[in-house]
Amino acid sequence: AIELCRVGSEMCIRDRSSTLGPPFASACRYILGTTGRVVVTGMGKSGHIAGKIAATLASTGTPAFFVHPGEASHGDMGMITASDCVIALSHSGNTHEILTLLPLIKRLGIPLISMTGSDTSELAQAADVHLLASVETEACPLNLAPTSSTTAALVMGDALAIAMLEARGFTAEEFAFSHPGGALGKRL
């Protein structure tokens, strides 16, 4: 298990360096140009990663929050405004709950950044910019449980957050403001 995790994680990190090109720069420009908040969404394991990405963005100077796509279809779309930007995660890029939101996002006229494992997926094709977070195989010996694919998405999300932190000139003092408790708060 340890070896599978090591190999899977190394593969994800190695493969991300080749995807940090023009689409990544475009995604950064969309996020920097957002006057509202960055709304991050995803279903299943991608949803857990989306929540972590939203939290990391928010704690490093980019206002962001997570919206569950199932809840968005039942009223929570009201949380998303015309001044926001959406980052949608789906490894397949064809997750029904995410695809249901696409016409609503388009109606708002806000940027849609997709993060999927396939450039040809419906979500990737609908997005204003697509970030490819593909992997050859999952670390799971059955090649089923989202393992390497979620690591790839997490790495891409962290890269976005750090790029935004640097672009905004976010300081340790600002970081301390959003981390008043815990070990990080004490350290700052």
Task: List the predicted regions and their residue ranges.
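Single conserved hydrophobic/aromatic residue that forms the stacking wall/gate
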Residues: A1-G8, I13
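Short, flexible, glycine/charge-rich loop motifs used to bind or transfer phosphoryl groups or to couple energy/partner
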Residues: A1-I2, A27-I31, H74-G78, T120
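A short, well-structured juxtamembrane/interface segment
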Residues: T19-T34
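Serine-centered coil/turn micro-motif
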Residues: P22, S121, G182-A183
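Glycine-rich phosphate-binding loops that contact phosphosugars or nucleotide phosphates
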Residues: G36-M43, G47-M164
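Internal, active-site/partner-interface "lid" segment
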Residues: Q125, A139, E166-L188
